[in-house]
Amino acid sequence: MKTKVAAIYGKRDVRLREFELPEITDNELLVSVISDSVCLSTWKAALLGSEHKRVPDDLENHPVITGHECAGVIVEVGKNLTGKYKKGQRFVLQPAMGLPSGYSAGYSYEYFGGNATYMIIPEIAINLGCVLPYYGSYFAAASLAEPMCCIIGAYHANYHTTQYVYEHRMGVKPGGNIALLACAGPMGIGAIDYAINGGIQPSRVVVVDIDDKRLAQVQKLLPVDLAASKGIELVYVNTKGMSDPVQTLRALTGDVGFDDIFVYAAVPAVVEMADELLAEDGCLNFFAGPTDKNFKVPFNFYNVHYNSTHVVGTSGGSTDDMKEAIALSATGQLQPSFMVTHIGGLDAVPDTVLNLPDIPGGKKLIYNGVTMPLTAIADFAEKGKTDPLFKELARLVEETHGIWNEQAEKYLLAQFGVDIGEAAQ
């Protein structure tokens, strides 16, 4: 089977590549990858090349396919797997394999990654339960289950303690104060959505950022009135220019501090602020992955000793987290489409990956069977004045107030003749 992929060839070197895949073995799957949402972790891998923990050597001869937030359709089933999978079945990939090597889809494999028209899912990923049946029909939601899975996993990884009781209570503190720092970006939107609609029921959620435009957008998507209707106080704060942001934020809790803090940017000042905002037994989750292996910040160990403050770091999520993300999206409790601001085809991947931090907006969603430059949804109407494809896409997203939706996805895929398979039974 001939495939077209976006692959890492070295540091800051991402290219389109077209080649014949080998025949699958009896314990592998050949799949068509319909959609992949671009992760900042992919940019980090492309930036570092083989210096990245998960990226192997010899990229020049064996380039690795980018992308891991993906979903698609099974095309061919190895004969030892016919009792579990069938041709035409939709799937979503759980890329967190948990291997000692750190290897996983989108970083480490020549034939296994989300930015591909076709890929081979290897035996090891199948044995680890990474291929989940997808019962829905909206591939964007399936792709976005992976970033939502990471967000959900972070909430589950936080923990709290009782003095002299040597068991951790996992999860955020019920009825507690949550601070989401540097959290008005694409992943932050998902974090706010889950805090309000995921059923964890904090009493207060404070969202902190320094970008008025991003804060205004997320407030439209997730307004304070929605949170209030669920018994949650939601506060949006721009700390840019504040003389004492720590005092201002602590005052929102009556100077008690925050029970659970999630840091969404690997910026020393943000981590230090998080430390100062912790309540007694407060848990700081360092969600943002740094590119610097020597990333260090001061931390108050007086509070560690006397106030039981503590730190966790999370990367990825479990299969159960993925299943929760899919289920909550299917019922409409979570709206992962809120995160999406740009749509593109496979041809857009190299430039998108290499310039991701400089492209404004939220998640960039790629449809591998589509040829289309990366385009902001907000620009569809203007482009539609001269292009009938964008004219219809603009009409379809207007029905959901500018949010990407299943009807727009189906129309786009149909224009390029993409086979979308059938829902898992």
Show where each model-derived region lies.
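Short N-terminal strand-loop motif that marks the start
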Residues: M1-T66, T400-Q425
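Glycine-rich beta-strand-centered segment in the early N-terminal region that forms part
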Residues: P22-S37, E51-P100, G113, L132
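NAD(P)H dinucleotide-binding glycine-rich loop of Rossmann-like/cofactor-binding domains
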Residues: P95-N177
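C-terminal hydrophobic helical "lid"/dimerization subdomain
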Residues: T162, K220, S243-T248, V256, ...
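Adenosine-nucleotide cofactor-binding segment
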Residues: G175-G176, L181, I192-V270, L393
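Hydrophobic/small residue at the entry helix of a nucleotide-binding pocket
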Residues: P186-M187, R214
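Rossmann-fold NAD(P)-binding glycine/threonine-rich loop
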Residues: A269-E272, E276, A288-S308
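Helix-to-beta-strand junctions that scaffold the AdoMet/dcAdoMet cofactor pocket
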Residues: L278-E280
